[in-house]
């Protein structure tokens, strides 16, 4: 596992965007051989999306031959609702870059057959071979996507019940009214994430410090689903300074030394 210790959320966003752009450009995608990118929503990736849009407008990257799969979507929320992940992704990213509409894959939380929707999503991912880079965030309780504590580490795309804590955390997007936050969501599974060639998790804020500690210094434990990344051959944690407050000093010093050359120029 790599840990990229930065100072601010803005630096995390810039580093992550630069990494994505470098991966896409090195891959040299074509219509027949697209780069497959997994994407999250929420507050954490906002600076990354902003930086990606800026880099696209500067001519540093094209998304014409990029295929995307989003991590999750609320169940029962109309896709036109401003807080649906369909709306979020178009508002903050898709509408500002040159990605073709047919290359965008989002779970349908209003599908008449939820099990079939989840199964078809997995099948479509497999049809591309694999996701080359999956970017994500992490919840205060260590959940990735909507794989809440005690999720199976072999799980696939499915419907999940959201914990009260997750709904409270997300209520900031719903006028701070937890009753407006859906109780269920469709989410890729832990196993789906582990199938990706590379997984990059962004970690921001002191409230995520225990989750980061569990991921880096703890044992693999389904109560902290983020810890599954210890099993992944190519996992990256990109974090700001407040999120590292629970790590041991020697742990942080170790990663600072390892990544010194990779965190310059931000």
From Swiss-Prot:
Protein activity control: Allosterically activated by N-acetylglucosamine 6-phosphate (GlcNAc6P).
Hydrolase listed as a keyword: yes
Transmembrane intervals: none
One GO molecular-function entry: identical protein binding
Top-level taxon in the UniProt lineage: Bacteria
Keywords, ordered alphabetically: Allosteric enzyme, Carbohydrate metabolism, Disulfide bond, Hydrolase
Enzyme Commission (EC) number: 3.5.99.6
Protein name: Glucosamine-6-phosphate deaminase
Source organism per UniProt: Escherichia coli O6:H1 (strain CFT073 / ATCC 700928 / UPEC)
Gene of this entry: nagB
């Amino acid at each position: 596992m790599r840990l990229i210790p930065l100072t601010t959320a803005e630096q995390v966003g810039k580093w992550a965007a630069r990494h994505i752009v470098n991966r896409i450009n090195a891959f040299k995608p074509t219509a027949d051989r697209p780069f497959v990118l997994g994407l999250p929503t929420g507050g954490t990736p906002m600076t990354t999306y902003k930086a990606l849009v800026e880099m696209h407008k500067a001519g540093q990257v094209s998304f014409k031959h990029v295929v995307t799969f989003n991590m999750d979507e609320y169940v029962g929320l109309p896709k036109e609702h401003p807080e649906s992940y369909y709306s979020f992704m178009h508002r903050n990213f898709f509408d500002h870059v040159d990605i073709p509409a047919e290359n965008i894959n989002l779970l349908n939380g209003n599908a008449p057959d939820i099990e079939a929707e989840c199964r078809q999503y997995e099948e479509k991912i497999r049809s591309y071979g694999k996701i080359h880079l999956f970017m994500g965030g992490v919840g205060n309780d260590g959940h990735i996507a909507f794989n809440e504590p005690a999720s199976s580490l072999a799980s696939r795309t499915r419907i999940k019940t959201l914990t009260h804590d997750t709904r409270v955390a997300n209520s900031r997007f719903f006028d701070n009214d937890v009753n407006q936050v859906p109780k269920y969501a469709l989410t890729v599974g832990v196993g789906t994430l582990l199938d990706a060639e590379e997984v990059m998790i962004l970690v921001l804020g002191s409230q995520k410090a225990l989750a980061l500690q569990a991921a880096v210094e703890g044992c693999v434990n389904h109560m902290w689903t983020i810890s599954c990344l210890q099993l992944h051959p190519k996992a990256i944690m990109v974090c700001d300074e407040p999120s590292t407050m629970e790590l041991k000093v020697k742990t942080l010093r170790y990663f600072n030394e390892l990544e010194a050359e990779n965190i310059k120029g931000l």
